[in-house]
Amino acid sequence: MSNKSYDNNVNINERKTQKKFILTTTEGKPLKFNLKDSNSDIEIESEVSNNDMVDTSQHFHKNNIVMKTTLNDDINHILKKETKIDELSRIDQFKIIEWLYIKLNRSNATDMLLEEVIENLKKPKSEISLNLILRKREKTMSEKLKNLKEKKYSCLEIAKLQFNKVTLDKISLFSKEILDLKINTVDEMKELASFVFVKAITEKAFLDTYTKLIGILKKNFKCAEEKNMGKESTCFFASLLKLMMKKIEENHTFNRDIYIDKENKTEIEIEEEIENAELARKLKRTQAIGAISFCVSLYKNSITGVANIKNTVNFLTKKPSSENIELLCEILRQGGPQLNINHSETVNQILHYIETHNIYGPRMEIIIEQTIEKLKREIKLNNVSTKSSNIFANLFISNTGIAENGKKINEREDIEKYFEEEILPGLGSCYEIADLEDMVDIIVHGFNQFNQSEFVFHYFTYVVTDNKNGTKLIELYSVFLADIISNKDVNIFSIIKRIKNDLNIYYIDYPCSKIKYPEMLCFVKSTGKITNEEFNALKVPDFEIKVKDLVYKWHSTSDERLHAVFNNCDIDRIINAL
């Protein structure tokens, strides 16, 4: 290095080509280092005038050392780091040792590491080598909020929001907004496709809306990565089809019996485990049937051809099972008439298969029978004639029996529609028992409009299967309707007997019916519309266990209906078993 000293007024810009530098004091005198003299820093500092003004954009102080070279910025940056290291080195060594003893496990491997660390800490300060260890830092709340905000306004999240908001009458508007989004990667398109697929197979009421929107996006909805590849097909639509077939070709087991290990478990734990298993099974069934409906909907809206349906039928007919039979029936219910026009051989194949494999008990018999009746009725209404090659052509020939059955089916559908549109929405605004009185006129009107026995049967069916409104309906019957809708033409015992015979079906589709049905019996018995013998005949296994919550509620509120159903011995036994 050069021994030449530089004055404070030297223009650094004039020395850009020079690479030599020296360390000076603020007065421009060369700095002499004396590592043995611990007071050197203090002596240099005493020479500095308090009136000295330093341009911090060009100079940096560390112990009054000033860097004045073309490399001063880099050196000053290093000195800043050195200052931080000096501060770290002042940590109490004894506290570090104590912390290490606590944090490190005392195994053979960690003993060696601990001894080495302690030995280094005991060395003179100048001899310790400082190793910077990087560790994952937990994000602050502001950083987390920032990430959430960035995610919220990403194109992917906006696209999901559009699918959540879309309505059937505004599909063109939402499709334009989605197509204008600039999604970058294929992975984002796959994530969006997965999101849309789950909505399509679980939200049955909006399936047609989603299908029509998908049809618009089918060809042109591409991300930047896809556009660069120059592919004609879209990752979004291809992913939807792949997810659909994957769901259809699963090993479906949603109709199988559930086995619960009762060992070392309380009754409450067993009931909870059964309830969770039933909910999981119901979700699997909903998704499987939803995938079939989605496949048929794509065909009905001319978005895909019949190939996917044929592949589905071929797969489901390979291995007989009650689940596969139910899914085949779903194909006919959703798209039978449309398929019968140009692909009657596919309808013929499904009908032949479900007829020859109708061996899975009364539940599947009912499903198959209702499917065929619905198919006949829709084909007749649409004036579609079946080809002579269809071996089930005789199913679609009109006769008086079919007309009579069709009338009954239409009446059942009208009653269900009346409940869905007139009764159930009104129950949503009833929060107290007194509020239920407002619904009496609506229910009596329906009772007088339709077949009375059939109407009461549907009423009690909703009590058993509707988890949200079932309790309100039976309270309404018990308090206001029991005397109004009961007459010689309505046999309450026979109606509830019909429901009891279908409980195996309800247990699968509506797990809440396991509790709702026994509780309904208690409410009906409290009105005196069934005798003790009829009440006992309508009971199910573990009846008292299933009504214990209702008994406790009535007992704690001194409800008079409790003693109309049970005697004192029964009440004490049920209460003490809680």
UniProtKB/Swiss-Prot annotation:
Family that this chain belongs to: Belongs to the eukaryotic initiation factor 4G family.
CC annotations in GO: cytoplasm
Cellular location(s): Cytoplasm
One GO molecular-function entry: translation initiation factor activity
GO aspect biological process, one term: regulation of translation
Source organism superkingdom: Eukaryota
Alphabetized InterPro entries for the sequence: ARM-type_fold, MIF4G-like_typ-3
Keyword RNA-binding: yes
Lineage, top ranks: Eukaryota, Fungi, Fungi incertae sedis, Microsporidia, Enterocytozoonidae
Task performed by this protein: Component of the protein complex eIF4F, which is involved in the recognition of the mRNA cap, ATP-dependent unwinding of 5'-terminal secondary structure and recruitment of mRNA to the ribosome.
One Pfam family hit: MIF4G
SUBUNIT field: Component of the eIF4F complex, which composition varies with external and internal environmental conditions.
Name of the protein: Probable eukaryotic translation initiation factor 4 gamma homolog
Keywords assigned by UniProt, alphabetized: Cytoplasm, Initiation factor, Protein biosynthesis, RNA-binding, Translation regulation
Domain MIF4G: 156-378
